[in-house]
Amino acid sequence: MSVQTYDDDYARDRAAIEDLMARYLFALDYNDLDTFIAMFTDDAVFDFARGRIEGKAAILEAVQSFKARIGEHYKDEDGNPAVLRHVLAHTAIRVEGHRAWTRAQWFEMANDGPGKSLKMGTFGIYEDKLERVDGRWLFSERRILNEFLPGRESGPGNPIRDMDALAG
């Protein structure tokens, strides 16, 4: 395992990457797909429950389709589309020059419980590769693991050790 070092730029890079990750979730949850797709490199890979997608146009099309299907699945008790919100728990970020890797735990909640109460729906881990392009951090690969879907779980090893092995 290689050890993360923290140079003078690490705090700035980490802040920019954390900001990107938060903006990603706001864009996704509020259906701002123009902002969402602008966060990816042109040749990005998006690996999620419906498969591995390559390239911005294909990613956008897949996410639009997925969001439409999710809207049909999550309903409040009156039959209206539920409000879905994603939350990041804790994030590890490794930066080396113009490349970075993240591991972050996430969960999703919706108001589809009794009395429109919140109910945790899904949870998992984001495994990201990022590139700094023209001074801006972008996702070059985002792999979304879902702990409740067979074949999409994390582990069995510590995800941070796996990230460090990739970087080192």
Predicted ranges, named:
Residues S2-T5, E72, G79-G168:
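A beta-strand edge to alpha-helix "cap/lid" segment located at domain peripheries
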Residues M1-M39:
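Short, low-complexity N-terminal intrinsically disordered segments enriched in polar/charged residues
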Residues L33-F107:
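A solvent-exposed, acidic/Ser-Thr-rich amphipathic alpha-helical stretch
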Residues A15, D19-M21, L60, G155-N158, ...:
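Binding-site signature for planar aromatic cofactors or substrates
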Residues D7, A11, I53, S117:
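Charge-dense, low-complexity intrinsically disordered segments
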Residues F26, A49, K116, M120:
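Short, charged/polar micro-motifs that form catalytic or ligand-binding hotspots
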